[in-house]
């Protein structure tokens, strides 16, 4: 209604309305407000693999003076995963992809078979891997290590090489939570009334 006389905005407003309406239907009606159950369903069908992460995203190498803290990060994550998915996770995305020798033993003790680490953790391994970052390598414990793919990461994060800086995309930092008059947007903000992103973005990327 607000943008009906502004066709360049109204088209996007209609798109957002349809998108949010469908998202609400999928969440509230189709999956009964239980997204984890939906992920479990597709994992049980063999359509995807859900892995875990550190319980509180603790940076494991900086905890190496307290192995019990490291173990807790892993074991609590495994227990929480098992509670929701009915089995232990096979893999883990290490917090910040940070690895040091010995972490693989803790993962093995928890029943985890593979982990994700940084690209250079694979590329500069000893001995150097034959296939670089394009295949997993195995630790002495038998736990596999996969390197984070840098090209995929650049597509998501880089303002120069990826879509965050491509003029064909909407600007993440231009949001109606900040662009619209405060009195209009206030009912859609949190209780404290502070402006924040609400997820509706009308402007394309035009520069840095």
Give the label of every model feature segment.
Residues 83, 97-113, 128-131, 142:
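Hydrophobic, small-residue-rich alpha-helical packing segments that form membrane-like cores
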Residues 54-56, 91-100, 120:
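Short, solvent-exposed turn/loop segments enriched in Gly/Ser/Thr/Pro and often Arg
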Residues 75-79, 116-119, 139-141, 169-173:
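Glycine-rich loops and low-complexity Gly/Arg-rich segments
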Residues 67-94, 208:
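CE4/NodB-like, metal-dependent polysaccharide N-deacetylase domain
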Residues 59, 112-125:
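His/Asp/Glu-enriched short active-site or ligand-binding loop at hydrolase and phosphoryl-transfer sites
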Residues 36-40, 74-78, 104:
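Generic structural signal for well-ordered alpha-helices
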Residues 47-51, 88-91, 104-107, 111-118, ...:
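Beta-sheet entry/capping signal
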Residues 1-64, 69, 126-208:
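Active-site cores of enzymes that catalyze phosphoryl transfer or operate on phosphate-rich substrates
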């Amino acid at each position: 209604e607000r943008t009906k006389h502004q066709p360049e905005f109204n088209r996007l407003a209609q798109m957002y309305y349809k998108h949010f309406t469908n998202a609400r239907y999928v969440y509230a009606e189709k999956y009964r407000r239980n997204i984890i159950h939906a992920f479990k369903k597709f994992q049980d069908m063999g359509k995807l693999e859900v892995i875990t992460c550190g319980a509180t995203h603790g940076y494991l190498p900086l905890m190496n003076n307290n192995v019990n803290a490291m173990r807790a990060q892993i074991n609590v994550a495994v227990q929480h995963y098992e509670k929701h998915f009915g089995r232990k996770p096979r893999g883990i995305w290490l917090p910040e992809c940070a690895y040091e020798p010995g972490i693989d033993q803790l993962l093995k003790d928890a029943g985890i078979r593979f982990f994700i680490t940084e690209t250079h953790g694979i590329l500069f391994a000893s001995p150097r891997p034959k296939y670089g970052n394009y295949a997993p390598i195995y630790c002495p414990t038998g736990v596999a290590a996969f390197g984070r793919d840098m090209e995929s990461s650049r597509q998501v994060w880089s303002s120069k090489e990826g879509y965050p800086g491509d003029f064909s995309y909407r600007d993440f930092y231009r949001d109606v939570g900040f662009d619209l008059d405060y009195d209009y947007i206030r009912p859609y903000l949190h209780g404290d009334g502070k402006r924040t992103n609400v997820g509706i973005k009308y402007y394309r990327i035009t520069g840095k």
